[in-house]
Swiss-Prot record:
Signal sequence bounds: none
Family: Belongs to the KdpA family.
Cellular location(s): Cell inner membrane
Entry GO terms, CC: plasma membrane
Protein name per its UniProtKB record: Potassium-transporting ATPase potassium-binding subunit
Keyword Membrane: yes
InterPro entries: KdpA (IPR004623)
Recorded superkingdom: Bacteria
Keywords: Cell inner membrane, Cell membrane, Ion transport, Membrane, Potassium, Potassium transport, Transmembrane, Transmembrane helix, Transport
Length: 571
């Protein structure tokens, strides 16, 4: 570990914190329907979209109607994307003459991008046309991110409102998230990425002759526009197979820093939106502090593990840390920081190969996802995921002191706790259930490239990533098979919608309740005690659930490596 590495980490944290209040204030005005700096240009477009779509922006929805609209929109998006992938060979903007995507891969890919997971069992430059990348994937990157933001805002309204049945309009919230937040920021980001050397073209792939006289095909395309929303919307799916490790997808150290910043900025700012909308910014800062503590712990362990490379590498006398699978232009610090950011925020983009990390270095990205992607998390999804843990933490605190649990003046009763636990427990069911299944059937065992505990970790990481809607992978797993394409897609769907719908049910229940005045016995939820309780609940409920599985994978791999034991390649 070096001073330069810690300075990079400190600078990143400082810039994120500096952007929380300005962006949080702006998004609060957007979702409250107030005038913003961009309103003169965008308000007419917004009204035009409502008029064309037949939407009454003043008509609000109950939680059930809100959930129904969201599910309907996502089903329509899935059907259109699946059709586009299956028919891409017949459609224009196919300069590389790509064939139609196979049915099981198209099902997996459509599910992946609709659920904001962006798991990729394919290489983008060898599988998809420009039209599929732009109209299919980039479009879903925008609307899946907007969908997560809309659900988060609906839950915030549940806490902020009283004695009402409505949570706002799903259509209006998604439109405003896309039009006022995502599109303007992505326009600026895409232009910046082009200035750094990122391609943005519809020209065919370039044929080049190497110094040895061999022919080489250099893939290009509309990269910058997709990368902008891939990071900002915490989607993560790469235009190229190497993702952000590819020089065309992440050309410079500056583009790398901005991509990391893009991943966290909206999720962090949404905590400020929460504080503003409930009338007490301290509530948002408390939640952000809990997220920050978990993030800092993860960065510290990962950076230490990769910089020291304990185990087999140190036994071989290597002293420069673990550089396998990392870009020399980024180094260990930026690679470790990126890995923790992308798995804390359910993004899944990578600038280094997580499969090549040390056992402990790979454990932290895995644990980040298993905690429920609540350390900043995906845009919207991170906040509503953490608020689900807040409900459980408040319930636990109430049990300990013998009082009816309250949060922001709302009683936390059996219905809210049941919905919260449904949202929490569906993730380990998918992650651990499918992992166990894959380790006892031939189709599952054929996937990992490594034997022993690391092979198990490759399977566990895949299903964890899918259910957590992250999308990153231990690349040694051969996932483009009927078995993995199908089971991973099921995990993505359950991980997305079996969390979203209970969250909206909680929002509807809370919005209908009266607000109780604070009393001397009210548990303060903006101080250090609450932050500690929240972190403890996240670690106990999220972490301990997965400890046996982690012990079979990265933990035993670490101790085996320290003893000099290696395992043969092959499943």
């Amino acid at each position: 570990m070096t001073l330069n590495g810690w300075m990079q980490i400190a600078l990143y944290g400082a810039v994120v914190l500096a952007l929380v209040r300005p962006l949080g204030g702006y998004m609060t005005r957007v979702f409250d329907g107030e005038r913003t700096l961009l309103s003169p240009a965008l308000a007419p477009i917004e009204r035009g979209l409502y008029r064309v779509s037949g939407i009454d922006a003043r008509q609000e929805q109950t939680w059930l109607a809100y959930a129904g609209a969201m599910v309907l929109f996502n089903v329509a998006g899935f059907v259109l994307l699946y059709a586009l992938l299956r028919l891409q060979a017949l459609l224009p903007l196919n300069p590389a003459d790509q064939a139609a995507v196979a049915p099981d891969l198209a099902f997996n890919t459509a599910t992946s991008f609709v659920t904001n997971t962006n798991w990729q069992s394919y290489g983008g430059e060898t599988t998809l046309t420009y039209l599929s990348q732009m109209l299919g994937l980039t479009h879903q990157n925008f609307v899946s991110a907007a969908s997560g933001m809309a659900v988060a805002v609906a839950l915030i309204r549940g806490f902020a409102r009283a004695s009402t049945k409505t949570l706002g309009s799903c259509w209006v919230d998604m439109t405003r998230a896309t039009l006022y937040v995502l599109l303007p920021l992505c326009t600026v980001l895409a232009l910046f990425y082009v200035s750094q050397g990122m391609p943005q073209t519809l020209s065919p792939y370039v044929e080049a002759t190497t110094l040895e006289g061999a022919k080489q095909t250099i893939a290009v395309g509309p990269v910058a526009s997709q990368v902008a929303i891939k990071m900002l919307g915490t989607n993560g799916g790469g235009f190229f197979n190497a993702n952000a490790a590819h020089p065309f997808e992440n050309p410079t150290a500056l583009s790398n820093f901005l991509q990391m910043l893009s991943i966290f900025v909206i999720g962090a700012a949404l905590t400020n939106v929460f504080g503003r909308m409930v009338g007490d910014e301290r509530q948002g800062w408390a939640i952000l502090t809990a997220m920050g503590l978990l993030f800092l712990a993860g960065v510290t362990v990962t950076y230490w593990a990769e910089a020291n490379a304990q185990g087999v590498l140190s036994n071989l006398g290597l002293t420069g840390g673990n550089m396998e699978g990392k870009e020399v232009r980024f180094g260990i610090a930026a690679s470790a920081l990126f890995a923790v950011i992308t798995t804390a925020a359910s993004c899944g983009a990578v600038n280094a190969m997580h499969d090549s990390f040390t056992a402990l270095g790979g454990l932290i990205p895995l644990l980040n996802m298993q905690l429920g992607e609540v350390i900043i998390g995906g845009v919207g999804a991170g906040l509503y995921g953490m608020l689900v843990f807040v409900v459980v933490a408040i319930f636990v605190a109430g049990l300990m002191v013998g009082r009816t649990p309250e949060y922001l003046g709302k009683k936390i009763e059996a219905r809210e706790v049941k919905m919260a636990m449904l949202g929490i427990l569906c993730l380990p069911l998918m992650m651990l259930g499918f992992t166990a299944f894959a380790t006892v059937v031939p189709d599952g065992l054929a996937g990992p490239a490594n034997a022993g505990p690391h092979g198990f970790s490759e399977i566990l990481y895949a299903y964890t990533s899918a259910a957590a809607n992250n999308g990153s992978a231990f690349g040694g797993l051969t996932a483009n098979t009927l078995f993995y394409n199908t089971t991973l897609a099921i995990g993505m769907l359950v991980g997305r919608f079996f969390v979203k719908i209970p969250v909206l049910a909680i929002a509807g229940s809370l919005a209908a309740k009266k607000r109780l005045p604070a009393s001397a016995g009210t548990f303060p939820t903006h101080g250090g005690l609450f932050v500690g309780l929240l972190v403890g609940v996240v670690l106990i409920i999220g972490g301990l659930t997965f400890f046996p599985a982690l012990a079979l994978g990265p933990v035993v791999e670490h101790f085996a490596g320290a003893a000099g034991q290696t395992f043969a390649t092959g499943g």
